[in-house]
């Protein structure tokens, strides 16, 4: 039974607009072979706990009084699960019928596989079917073959990623033909089936990465330990764009992104690299601010990003007050330059 092998862990934060349809999509994908779902909530105020409590079936609610971040919420679900595999996902994701079973089987065939995903397509509306040739008419999929670095982040803030989305030195991903087995450096943050023992071995997600870069950090630590990550065309994963943080990005989430990227750099590339990246990215943002003010009359200003860098510098590389909503998880040091940040293990 799938329930003996896989637990679905989904993180919610005021997600009632998508949660009812999420449960239906899981039911469709696991028809006749249901598995347990753990709803890990980060202090929602939209009645999600009552809604889950009224549902029948293999459902459990793991609530938290405040928002502790995406990775910290996933950690609660991974710890509570008792199956050898866990599916970590957003509530705006759908997987084709039988897909969970296919991914579990795929990983069972590869003992060193720590994580696997189907081929992911990002859409505005859920398709009526999961026909691969319709969702991927060119037969190509975008997968990660590298990790974020100062060049990819400079291209992000300068806009070069938008103009040249397929240049390998500007982005950490490439497009390749869809096939049964694609070894990758990281999985898409919206979905992945993971070997629970491997996650426990490396210490789960780093709670200091409140939002963004948590999957990059996890993937890098898994591969450092000798584990493998894969994307397979055995199943299709649909992510509905327009409902998550990337689509509703606000000034708050943009500042969280800044802090997470520098913490990731500090953790894996060292202090000197991170400070060099800090000033290089700040310089690019400065040029962007000047252009918007002088040429576009202040429209689309990046001044809040520029000001964050100044405040962080005055803090000695700390996280400026207000960056992490509600202060985040108790006892967690979010300062990106903190000397206690360990290197990858």
Regions found by a protein language model. Give the residues of each.
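Short, well-formed alpha-helical segments that are part of the catalytic scaffolds
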Residues: 15-30
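A conserved acidic beta->alpha catalytic loop
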Residues: 25, 41-49, 66
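Acidic donor-binding/catalytic loop of UDP-sugar-dependent glycosyltransferases
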Residues: 47, 71, 93-106
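Glycine-rich, basic loop-to-helix element that forms the pyrophosphate-binding segment
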Residues: 63-81
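Short aromatic/hydrophobic "clamp" motif used to bind/position activated sugar donors
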Residues: 86
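Acidic/His-rich active-site region of diverse nucleotide-sugar glycosyltransferases
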Residues: 105-202
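Non-catalytic, C-terminal membrane-associated alpha-helical segments of glycosyltransferases
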Residues: 252-260, 271-345
């Amino acid at each position: 039974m799938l329930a003996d092998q896989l637990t679905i862990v989904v993180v919610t934060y005021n997600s009632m607009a998508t949660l009812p349809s999420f449960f239906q999509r899981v039911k469709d994908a696991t028809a006749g072979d249901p598995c347990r779902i753990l709803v890990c909530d980060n202090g929602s105020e939209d009645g999600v706990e009552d809604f889950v409590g009224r549902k029948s079936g293999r459902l459990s609610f793991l609530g938290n009084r405040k928002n502790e971040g995406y990775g910290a919420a996933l950690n609660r679900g991974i710890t509570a699960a008792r199956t050898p595999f866990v599916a970590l996902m957003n509530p705006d994701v759908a997987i084709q019928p039988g897909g969970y079973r296919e991914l579990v089987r795929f990983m069972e065939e590869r003992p060193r596989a720590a994580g696997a995903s189907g081929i992911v397509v990002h859409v505005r509306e859920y398709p009526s079917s999961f026909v691969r040739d319709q969702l991927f008419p060119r037969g190509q999929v975008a997968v990660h073959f590298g990790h974020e670095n100062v060049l990819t982040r400079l291209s992000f803030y300068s806009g070069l990623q938008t103009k040249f989305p397929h240049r390998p030195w500007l982005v950490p991903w490439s497009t390749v033909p869809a096939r049964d087995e694609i070894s990758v450096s990281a999985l898409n943050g919206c979905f992945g089936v993971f070997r629970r023992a491997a996650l426990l071995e490396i210490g789960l997600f780093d709670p200091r990465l409140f939002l963004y870069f948590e999957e990059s950090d996890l993937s890098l630590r898994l591969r450092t330990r000798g584990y493998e990550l894969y994307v397979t065309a055995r199943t299709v994963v649909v992510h509905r764009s327009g409902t998550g943080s990337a689509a509703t990005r606000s000034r708050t989430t943009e500042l969280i992104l800044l802090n997470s990227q520098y913490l990731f750099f500090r953790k894996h590339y060292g202090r000197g690299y991170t400070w060099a990246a800090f000033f290089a990215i700040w310089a690019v943002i400065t040029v962007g601010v000047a252009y918007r003010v002088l040429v576009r009359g202040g429209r689309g200003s990046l001044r809040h990003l520029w000001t964050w860098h100044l405040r962080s510098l005055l803090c000695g590389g700390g996280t400026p007050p207000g960056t992490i909503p509600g202060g985040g998880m108790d006892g967690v040091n979010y300062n990106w330059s903190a000397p206690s940040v360990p290197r990858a293990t």
